[in-house]
Each structure stands twice: as C-alpha cells, then as structure tokens.
C-alpha cells in the first residue's frame, strides 16, 4: 500500500473489508460540525471512487460501518489512527487530526476500490510545519479557484502551511 506521506506505523493484515450499499458512514455523537463537514468530503470521495452513495449519520456504528470517532486522549494533537478490518473501518483522532485519517483512507480507497485491505495505521506529523511555497512574482498571479484547488491538494498530502509570494 502506497500512502503519501508514509505513516509512522502501517501494518497490513491478510483480511479485507468490503464496502456495500448497506454501509453507513457514521460520525460519533461527540464530534463537532467541523468533523461532520470532513465526513462529507469522505462521503463524496467514496461515491467518486466506488459509485456507492453511503448514508451519513450521527450516532453509534453497526458492524460493517465506517466510524469517524473523536478522541482527545492521544499522544499528539495531530495523531490519528485508521483501522480497516472485516468488522468495519474506524478513523479516530482529534478535531485537528481526523482530516489526516480521512485523507489516508481516501488514498487507500483510490488504490483498492470497494474491496479494502485490512490495515492498521497510526500516524502523526514528524515536523510541526509542513508547507508549500508558491512564488508568483515572475508570472501571472494565480486565480482564487486555482488556490482553492491547490489547498485541496495540500490537504491530501497533510501540509499545513501555504506561503504565496506575490
């Protein structure tokens, strides 16, 4: 499995998880609206990559569902854990780090489709600042739509700083 950037811990298992039309995308009750918006991004990515339009709901997950869980008791504010097994998918982290777990899951989804390999991923950034520097002094100033697309790509690779030099 190729995940960029490479996580601190990635363990592949022999089992797999199969997405289906009966799968729900569940956001745990204690999650904020910010996390719920991130879950919508995951819902769109699942539909784009598999064709399944999963129901997004709050509450408790059933066996076989995808659960996004808020957890404060983590070693680092940007730490997350992703577990994929036959029982379902669990993405755990802080409000700040759940987006990183979602982005990792999307990378797995893009490589595997609806039949996801069993994985255990634990990750946190190695550096506090991970950024992209865009120098537009000798060319055209980028449009806002381009900058938004660039920000989406930065989120995909877990970058947290953007410097635009005009």
State what each model feature region is:
Residues 80-82, 142-150:
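Short, polar loop/linker segments at the starts of domains and inter-domain junctions
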Residues 105-108, 112, 135, 153, ...:
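Mid-sequence acidic-hydrophobic segments that form the walls
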Residues 1-130:
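Contiguous, structured surface segment used for ligand recognition
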Residues 92, 130-144:
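The substrate-binding groove and active-site-proximal loops of carbohydrate-active enzymes
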Residues 28, 135, 165:
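Conserved residues at the C-terminal ends of beta-strands
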Residues 146-166:
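Catalytic domains of carbohydrate-active enzymes, especially glycoside hydrolases
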Residues 97, 124, 138-142, 146:
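Short, well-structured alpha-helical patches and their helix-loop capping segments
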């Amino acid at each position: 499995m190729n995940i960029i950037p490479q996580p601190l811990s990635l363990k592949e298992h022999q089992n797999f998880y199969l997405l289906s039309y009966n799968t729900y995308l569940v956001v745990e009750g204690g999650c904020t609206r910010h996390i719920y918006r991130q879950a919508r991004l995951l819902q769109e990515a699942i539909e784009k990559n598999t064709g399944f339009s999963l129901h997004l709901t709050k509450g408790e997950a059933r066996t076989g569902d995808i659960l996004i869980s808020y957890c404060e008791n983590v070693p680092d504010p940007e730490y997350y854990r992703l577990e994929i097994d036959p029982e379902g998918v669990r993405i755990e982290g802080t409000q700040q780090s759940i987006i990183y777990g979602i982005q990792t899951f999307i990378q797995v989804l893009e490589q595997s489709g609806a039949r996801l390999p069993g994985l255990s991923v634990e990750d946190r950034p190695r550096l506090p600042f991970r950024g992209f520097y865009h120098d537009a002094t000798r060319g055209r100033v980028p449009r806002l739509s381009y900058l938004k697309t660039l920000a989406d790509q930065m989120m995909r690779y877990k970058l947290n700083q953007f410097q635009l030099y005009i």
